[in-house]
Every structure is written in C-alpha cells, then in structure tokens.
Amino acid sequence: VLSPADKSNVKAAWGKVGSHAGDYGAEALERMFLSFPTTKTYFPHFDLSHGSAQVKGHGKKVADALTNAVAHVDDMPNALSALSDLHAHKLRVDPVNFKLLSHCLLVTLAAHHPAEFTPAVHASLDKFLASVSTVLTSKYR
C-alpha cells in the first residue's frame, strides 16, 4: 500500500519526467530486451533495434499508462482495467515481465535524474511500480 509520502514522491518524480516519458519508456524497453532477451518473444513482429519506431511507440504507450496510473494513484484498478484485460486475456504476458520492465524503468529514471533519485524516491517508485504490476496481473486469476 502506498503511503501519502509515497504518493507524493511518485507524483513529484513522474512530474520531473515530463515530456521525456515516451523516451524513457522506450529506453526502459530497450534495457529490458538487452538484459532479459526472453522478453523479446512477446514482440516477434517488432523491429527491436536501437531507436526503432516500434519500440519508441510502445515505450510511449508504457509511459502513457504510467502517467495515467500516477494521475489515478488512488484508483489504479479502474484506471488500468482495460490494460489489465488486454495483458491477461489477449497478450498473455507472463507476470514476471512486469517486474523486469519495472526494474529497467527504475534504472532509466535513476540514470536520467540521479539527484532526485534519493533512497526514499527509489523506494516509493518501486512500490508504485509493484502496485501497477499487481493491478495488471489481477485478472490473470
């Protein structure tokens, strides 16, 4: 459960991401594909090379979903319901992949915002991304 301090940290950190959200989403995906090659199996139709338009496009989708989750941090299950359905019933993404992408997103944010990425912000973002992952996998059962 996210505390009021966690919610404040997440909103402040994501606010600093701003117009770079799509780029950071794409960078996190690239990190995931390079660090965890098995994740590529969910994207057989994508050009997974560095800077590809498809990875950038999906990175923007990831970032937009996270922006939506931040905006609705007190009601993520409703805000992410359609996305949860998509990943559980159509795409059938292994839930472990959400953890891998979350890790890569944390690394990306830390690399771009080292001064703001304090231990408290890191912990809050980690809890937030875990909450998003829980919501996205809630319909797998």
From Swiss-Prot:
Q: Name one GO molecular function term.
A: oxygen carrier activity
- So where does heme b get bound? 87
Record domain Globin: where: 1-141
Tissue expression pattern: Red blood cells.
Q: Which UniProt keywords apply?
A: Acetylation, Heme, Iron, Metal-binding, Oxygen transport, Phosphoprotein, Transport
Asked whether the UniProt record includes Chloroplast among its keywords, one would answer no
Residues modified as N6-acetyllysine are 16
- Phosphotyrosine carried by residues: 24
List modified residues, type Phosphothreonine. Answer: 108, 134, 137
Protein residues bound to O2: 58
List the record's Gene Ontology CC terms alphabetically: blood microparticle; haptoglobin-hemoglobin complex; hemoglobin complex
Give the residue spans that cross the bilayer.
Answer: none
The family database entries (SUPFAM superfamilies) matched by this protein are listed as: Globin-like
Residues carrying N6-succinyllysine: 7, 11, 16, 40
Extract one GO BP annotation from the record. hydrogen peroxide catabolic process
Q: Where Phosphoserine occurs along the chain?
A: 3, 35, 49, 102, 124, 131, 138
What function does the entry list? Involved in oxygen transport from the lung to the various peripheral tissues.
Instruction: Cite the record's note on assembly.
Output: Heterotetramer of two alpha chains and two beta chains.
UniProt similarity note: Belongs to the globin family.
Q: What is this protein called?
A: Hemoglobin subunit alpha
Identify the species of origin: Mico argentatus (Silvery marmoset)
